[in-house]
Amino acid sequence: MNITIKSSRTVDGNIAAPPSKSMAHRAVLCAALAKGTSHLHHLAFSKDISATLGAAARLCARVTTGENDAVVEGLGRFLPVDAPVDCCESGSTLRFLIPLASLTGQEVTFTGRGRLMERPQSVYKTLYQQQGLRFEQGADRLTVEGALTPGEYELAGNVSSQFISGLLFALPLLGGTSTLHLIPPVESRSYIDMTRAVQHAFGVESRWLDENTLEIPGGQHYLPGDYTVEGDYSQAAFPAVLGAVTGGVAITGLSEETLQGDAAILEILRRCGARFTRTGQGVVFEKAPLHGTDIDLADCPDLGPVLMVLGLLCEGTTVIRNAERLRIKESDRIEAMETELRACGGQLESEGGTITIHGCAGALHAPEQPLSGHNDHRVVMSLAVLALATGLALPISGAEAIAKSWPDFLEAIKPLGAEVEHVG
């Protein structure tokens, strides 16, 4: 899908944060592992969440979806897996399910699309080899076989928290107690605690013995229940950056009491000089002069692309550190954003996981050729923010990538003054 996006008027208006994708993944799996019927409220059926729902239905549950909810009937047993489980492009789906597949007593093969099977799984590969289990990763599929055992596990704490969460889902169902030793530094701790909080809502417990060690009692059972998903700070970051630059934007549906690591967007914007007010379940932005700052992305890597846009629109220099994981997402997000922002006159450079961005709002211009979305939802949405914040008409190819996380994004931003033209 090729589009041209621009602002049709002064940017202002209200936008609702979509349901949290991170929390929805976790709630779907907990509900599927619980014997009985659970009702999940406030869902958005992005491609990633649809992948997790589909995988749950293949492995251990019956799933019925409504307009924005789902009924998940956990069967209390694993079904025969006679064909590959399709994870589409969802890294969360794949990494959460690999340890659970090892509880089925079967050979389980996962497939995916885009760059999914290129993304590193060495944490699991090493763990499986240590336990004498089968772990084979090819160009388009990944196969596991053999049963995990309770005991001591050691993982690097600076890898994706998805690996740690995947083990947290499976280990409580084993017969004995397990301990996860995380080698510091532990990054994305908020996502680990989000997993634990959703598990708690479904009757499964774990505890921190110290800041680097988790104890997971075995012999537990997930319990069915009703669960309502919070609004998503990861997605709200896009209108939040826009609101910080232009003012006049109100975002609804954001809980102040949240475990979402990407809620850090508000503190980052505050450090840049943004002016906003919390209003219960919302945030209202006023226009204010913005300046560059130093940003540590270790605990909130998904904010990276839109913060690169923010840096261009601030006075002075913005430095983003610990952004290495952006290179192994749906695209190499550092390279993708550098390429597209430079095409618009952006001044930025990177070395490893450090990105330096020079404020240059007055020098930005429309590109000579359409910008590429790089098959990456966060790249597309970040470029849309750039268009609306600057008033430039930006042509973007591959805009369909937004379906991965926020299918209604283009419609959602129209009340803010966005004009979206579909080309070809």
PLM regions: where:
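Short, structured segments at the rim of ligand-binding sites
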Residues: M1-G424
